[in-house]
Regions:
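Juxtamembrane loop-to-helix connectors within ABC transporter transmembrane domains
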Residues: 72, 142, 146, 160-207, ...
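ABC-type nucleotide-binding domain
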Residues: 392-650
Length: 650
């Protein structure tokens, strides 16, 4: 109980009773390097309250064992060989104390004893070499199996992530998913090392204990082994406490790293708002929590090590004393005493190793449970080729789209309907502009059409087929070219970003190069790449940060055009461009649209974007309140459109 109170975040109970409560005042409590200046900050208290709402670490259950066996099964040949090597090395180690006892008994036996010692010394040397070779084989086989398991796990886990619906990423933090892809899978794959250590320790402990029973008179066994039982029980209880504190420290460290990753990813926003000091205070607040948990972990770990070192030393003295008594009484020989002492030490250390391996296996199963939470709920999606084969209609014809009584709410906000009974008909080849206030649901229409979300009610018809019911979302996406208001580029060259949506088959590379060249020229990407030293091979940087906002948007437009889509979706696509670039892109898009004969959906706030549209739909509170030819709508605007024009919200 004293140790439990000492490890608690509130501190020891005995200190709480001291005059003036020295623990809470900070006199006896270890001072954090940040506490003195953070406790006065409101952000610090917010961080403290946030840390209390910690997510519990998934407890390992027996349900994870079948999945663990499924992961290990492809490596069963390696594991069988590793188990054989483990048994060989354990046999060598267990025979060593017996041979050493025989050698000691032959000391002082004259010429015959000397020959015996020489022969058995050579035999012991050969056994040591054989044991080392067996250990090498065991570790090599296990380590290679670990790498193969980690490879498959990461491959399956990443596949499961990229196939999850977008709503999953709205409800889960990217940092946590990346941590599972890295640390949790690494810890899960290390279960083989822990299991082999546990098996080896169990074999050594069991055989060592049996040898002790054989060497020691029965009336002395209880007195010799009773300290082992006491050390074992105490070590198990204390070890659980240490693991719980270590898990708390890891969780708080993960929170700090996640915050740092998020803020460094948005460093431009931090710098724009001069928020460096604010972020430093917030990060130091989280580090303070890590420090407190780390101090508790250090104290508990040091106590556990002290316990085992002290207990092991006392146990060794206990063995020496009892062996001395037995030798003096003539019960056993000196050689038998040496063997007995070595077996006792091996059994004691093996029990300790088994406890440590058991705790590590529990951690591995806990990490495995986190990974299985994703793998076990991964959606099975049909291959794109099957969807394309099932689709009908000419590949070159524009898409016809119809929204029929569509309602939708985001999974993260189920209480707020974004679309309510929306009806919208986009004929094949039409160029429809969607107007509306911010938050009216304009961009949600594009997200639903791209299949990133499924409507909660209603149907979306594409070329006369129910996109959701007939599972044509993947095929529909292959027919779309989407340019969003937030351009997203990857950390690769501009050319690779433009050809991202094209076939990766090397056979199509020549055709891809031609499409990239034409799309880059149409989107005016070549206007700025021609002046760069590496041209289209220039790296875009992480998230495209090496390019300006307008340049990123033009690359995104080229990426959409390179697919020769049957429908183009512009969601504020030119909002990041200056007037000159916007005019040039509009002219290029007008040429592309007239030559490609594709449908077009334009979500915009700018009147200039309406010049190449022939239909206008006005969206208000998640529903289309006016729809028709552009000239008719602008000449007879509804109340919602009048309000938009009056407030100059274009």
């Amino acid at each position: 109980m004293l140790v439990r109170r000492l490890m608690s975040p509130q501190g020891p109970r005995c200190f709480a009773r001291c005059p003036g409560n020295l623990w809470s005042s900070g006199v006896l409590r270890p001072a954090s390097p940040f506490r003195s200046r953070l406790v006065r900050q409101p952000l610090y208290h917010a961080v403290r309250s946030f840390s209390k709402d910690e997510k519990p670490t998934p407890k390992p259950t027996a349900a994870g064992l079948p999945q663990l066996w499924h992961l290990l099964r492809p490596e069963r040949r390696r594991l069988q060989l590793a188990l054989a090597a483990l048994c060989a090395s354990s046999s060598v180690n267990l025979s060593y104390p017996y041979l050493m006892g025989r050698l000691v008994d032959m000391f002082g036996e004259g010429q015959e004893g000397l020959l015996f010692v020489m022969d058995h010394t050579a035999l012991c040397g050969l056994l040591v070499v054989a044991g080392g070779a067996a250990t090498f084989c065991r570790l090599y086989l296990i380590e290679t199996a670990i790498e193969r398991i980690a490879f498959r796990l990461r491959q399956q886990f990443f596949k499961a992530l990229v196939e999850r619906p977008i709503a999953f990423f709205d409800q889960n933090k990217t940092g946590e998913l990346v941590n599972r892809l890295g640390n949790d899978i690494t810890m899960t794959s290390r279960v083989l090392i822990d299991a082999s250590a546990g098996i080896r320790g169990s074999i050594t402990a069991a055989v060592g204990t049996c040898m002790i029973f054989q060497l020691v008179p029965r009336e002395m066994i209880l007195g010799l082994l009773s300290p082992v039982l006491a050390l074992f029980v105490t070590g198990v209880l204390y070890g659980r406490l240490v693991r719980r504190i270590a898990e708390r420290r890891q969780q708080r460290l993960a929170e700090a790293v996640q915050r740092a990753e998020e803020r460094l990813g948005g460093i431009r926003t931090v710098r724009t708002f001069n928020a460096e000091a604010r972020e430093l205070r917030g990060f130091e607040g989280l580090l303070d929590l890590v420090y407190q948990a780390g101090w508790q972990n250090a104290l508990a770990s040091a106590g556990l090590s002290c316990f085992f070192v002290t207990g092991g030393g006392l146990f060794l003295l206990h063995i020496i004393y009892n062996c001395g008594v037995m030798v003096s009484s003539g019960v056993v020989s000196v050689g038998t005493t040496v063997s007995l002492a070595m077996y006792c030490l091996m059994a004691g250390s093996s029990y300790t190793g088994v406890m440590a391996a058991y705790g590590d296996i529990q951690k591995c199963l806990g990490s495995l449970q986190k990974v299985l939470d994703i793998l076990g709920t991964a959606e099975v999606r049909p291959a794109l080729s099957q969807s394309v084969a099932a689709a009908s209609g000419a590949a070159s014809a524009p898409l016809a789209v119809k929204f029929e009584n569509v309602s939708f709410f985001y999974p993260a906000r189920p209480q707020a309907n974004v679309l309510q009974g929306l009806n919208l008909d986009i004929p094949a080849g039409a160029r429809v502009a969607i107007l509306g206030r911010s938050g009216s649901g304009k961009s949600t229409i594009a997200l639903l059409l791209a299949g990133l979300y499924a409507p909660t009610e209603g149907k979306i018809w594409v070329d006369g087929h129910d996109m959701v019911a007939e599972d044509r979302t993947a095929w529909v996406r292959s027919q779309l070219g989407v340019i969003s208001q937030e351009p997203t580029l990857f950390a690769m060259s501009i050319k690779e970003n433009v050809e991202y949506g094209l076939s990766p088959d090397p056979v199509d590379q020549a055709s891809n190069d031609l499409k990239v060249k034409e799309a880059a020229a149409a989107a005016h990407v070549t206007e700025f790449t021609d002046g760069l030293p590496h041209g289209m091979d220039t790296l875009a940087g992480e998230r495209g940060q090496a390019l300006s906002g307008g340049q990123k948007q033009r690359v995104c437009i080229a990426r959409a055009l390179a697919r020769t889509p049957r429908m183009l979706i512009f969601d504020e696509a030119t909002s990041a461009l200056d007037l000159r670039s916007e005019r040039a892109v509009h002219e290029a898009l007008q040429e592309v649209l007239s030559s490609q004969n594709c449908s077009c959906l334009v979500i915009t706030h700018r009147m200039s974007s309406l010049q190449w549209c022939d239909h206008v739909a006005v969206v208000e509170e998640g529903a289309v309140v006016q729809y028709g030819q552009k000239e008719e709508v602008l000449q007879n605007p509804c109340t919602a459109l009048q309000s938009i024009l009056r407030n100059d919200e274009f």
